[in-house]
């Protein structure tokens, strides 16, 4: 037993490390090959593997650096998770939307794959099961921009209520879909099927209104996706960000410890971002202060 232990102890000094280094080298080669030759597919798999929004945002920035577009959700293209389209772009998945459940996602994708793309919002509400895709799901889809592929309406129109009416555009659309599905079910159950004189329900007219501002649109997007998809609030300040020597928050966090220790005394650093959280704290001497948490485009 002593001899076996001594032999294995000496063997383990090199065999264990070499075997692991070989395996890691092989995995690294596979990863590099996939990223170089199948960048869209590789990065969509990486995004699907991430468990929190900060890591997803980080890898979306990597996609941007690689020249790969990450597009918002689309009712005629999105799958459950991130997926690559025919152009090599990555499409945001319906599974990442708050308020859209598993049954709704399955119903939307299954119907689309079976009977083709949805022609417009009215075709959509006629075809999907409203027991699965309820009003809450529809609201989240609108907020996320999933219906932007239907150019007839912009997002604000779905929530606009005309003076003197009690329902907004989306509620009119939902009611239309319910009536059409009821008529379809009733016709199917008749002895002779669909009759030439079957009732026709006209599509409701959705009143025009002003579109949302960029800030409103982005805030709604972030509410349901966890991130800004169509742009960024700092897009209003592109000139300032470009010409005022702005330091990214990520870089500033890397060097701030050195600044505290006295390095680069007299040098000024400018950062620009959105304050996403503010914590109110108290010092040991009972002085109140606030600690903001800013975020820029790269964080």
For the regions a protein language model found, what residue spans apply to each?
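Noncatalytic, beta-rich nucleic-acid-contacting surfaces in large DNA/RNA-processing enzymes
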Residues: 1-291, 295-297
């Amino acid at each position: 037993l002593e001899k076996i232990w001594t032999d294995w102890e000496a063997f383990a000094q090199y065999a264990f490390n070499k075997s692991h280094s070989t395996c890691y080298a092989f995995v690294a080669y596979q990863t590099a090959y996939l990223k170089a030759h199948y960048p869209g597919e590789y990065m969509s798999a990486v995004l699907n593997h991430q468990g929190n929004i900060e890591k997803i945002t980080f890898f979306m920035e990597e996609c941007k650096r690689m020249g790969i577009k990450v597009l918002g959700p689309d009712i005629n293209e999105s799958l459950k998770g991130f997926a690559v389209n025919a152009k090599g772009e990555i499409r945001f998945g319906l599974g990442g939307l708050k308020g859209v459940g598993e049954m709704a996602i399955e119903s939307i994708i299954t119907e689309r794959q079976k009977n083709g793309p949805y022609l417009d919002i009215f075709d959509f509400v006629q075809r999907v099961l409203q027991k699965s895709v309820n009003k809450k799901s529809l609201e989240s889809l609108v907020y996320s921009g999933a219906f932007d592929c239907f150019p007839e309406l912009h997002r604000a129109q779905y929530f606009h209520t005309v003076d003197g009416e009690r329902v907004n555009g989306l509620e009119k659309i939902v009611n239309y879909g319910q009536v059409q599905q009821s008529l379809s079910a009733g016709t199917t159950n008749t002895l002779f099927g669909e009759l030439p004189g079957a009732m026709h329900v006209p599509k409701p007219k959705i009143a025009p209104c002003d579109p949302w501002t960029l800030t409103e649109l982005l805030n709604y997007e972030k509410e349901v996706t966890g991130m800004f998809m169509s742009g960024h609030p700092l897009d209003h300040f592109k000139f300032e960000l470009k010409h005022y020597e702005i330091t990214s928050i990520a870089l500033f966090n890397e060097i701030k410890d050195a600044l505290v220790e006295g390095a680069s005394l007299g040098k000024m650093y400018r950062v620009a971002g959105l304050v996403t959280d503010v914590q109110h704290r108290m010092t040991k001497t009972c002085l109140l202060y606030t600690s903001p948490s800013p975020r820029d485009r790269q964080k």
